[in-house]
Design a protein with these regions (language model features):
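ABC ATPase NBD coupling module
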Residues: 30-31, 87-103, 117, 121, ...
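Helix-to-loop junction immediately C-terminal to a conserved catalytic motif
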Residues: 70
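Conserved ABC transporter NBD signature motif
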Residues: 78-89
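Conserved ABC ATPase "signature" region
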Residues: 140-158, 267
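Conserved ABC ATPase signature
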Residues: 163-167, 171
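A short, surface-exposed alpha-helical micro-motif characterized by mixed small hydrophobic
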Residues: 230-232
């Protein structure tokens, strides 16, 4: 036996031979038409503390992949695993365990907040649902935890008494991130979380994601159609086209020497993109 061989770490999140198909009208006994596949027999491994970017043009399958990884939708074939455990989309017990470990930042984070609800209540809700023991131990005194998570996202605790509809766009984005962080997840899945923001705000949220993932030792999978939003944040980049992952390499290598024409096309959309600082 060679004692100098290094064991490959087990993935924290994985898709194994997953297939997803577009909804078509067919009878129950009819086989799925392979031509309707969004992606077919796709496998992907994500390590616990890595930051990964998933980029591709609209309609390439990015959002469907993310929904499958979130167990929001069951795959037609294949499976999703977290830390070696099979995630069952129809099982409340499985999903509660999974949501404690993996949290989601939606495409329109601000729009995910009920406008008439206080910020404090928006943050307490996932804590009650996913960490009830922590709520019981706090005996109703969880103001310290709320202040802590607000500080992590760069917001004053004075905003806790405001309703979400009173927040600015940037504040709402940060509250949505705080809502994901409050349950102390180990991994974040983000679906174009900065779409609709102006460039200065996008850069602020990008820097904040880097900061909180480093501080909390969390992994991140961030989906974007804009490759510039992943540069400087994600160490590994996946490029998706036509339901296939056509590149999976360190971000610096993808930016410096794209191996696929589709990747080069995505890079041409941001000609000022620089790889300096890596």
């Amino acid at each position: 036996m060679n004692h100098h061989l290094h064991a490959v770490p087990s993935p924290f999140l994985s898709l194994e031979h997953v297939s997803r198909y577009r909804q078509t009208s067919r009878l129950p006994w009819q086989k799925t038409d392979p031509a309707s596949a969004i992606f077919h027999d796709l496998s992907l491994n994500l390590q616990q503390h890595e930051r990964v970017g998933l980029v591709g043009a609209s309609g390439c399958g990015k959002s469907t992949l993310l929904k499958t990884l979130l167990a929001l939708e069951a795959p037609e074939s294949g499976a999703v695993y977290c830390d070696g455990n099979l995630i069952k989309p129809g099982s409340v017990r499985s999903l509660l365990w999974y949501r404690r470990r993996v949290q989601y930042i939606p495409q329109d984070p601000a729009g995910s907040l009920a406008p008439r609800q206080r910020v404090a209540d928006l943050l307490i809700e996932p804590l009650k649902r996913l960490r009830p023991d922590e709520i019981r131990h706090a005996n109703g005194h969880y103001s310290a935890r709320l202040s802590e998570v607000m500080d992590q996202v760069g917001l004053s605790a004075t905003l806790l008494d405001k309703v979400a509809g009173q927040l600015s766009g940037g504040q709402a984005q940060r509250v949505a991130l705080a809502r994901a962080l409050i349950v102390r997840p180990e991994f974040l899945l983000a679906d174009e979380p900065v779409s609709g923001l102006d460039l200065p705000l996008r850069e602020q949220i990008k820097a904040l994601l880097q900061q909180v993932t480093e501080q909390n030792k969390m992994g991140l999978l961030m989906v974007s159609h804009d490759i510039s939003m992943l540069a400087g944040l994600c160490d590994r980049m996946l490029v998706m086209d036509g339901g296939r992952i056509i590149e999976d390499r360190p971000t610096t290598q993808v930016l410096a020497s794209p191996q696929q024409a589709h990747t080069a096309h995505l890079l041409q959309a941001v000609p000022a993109l620089s790889t300096s600082g890596y």
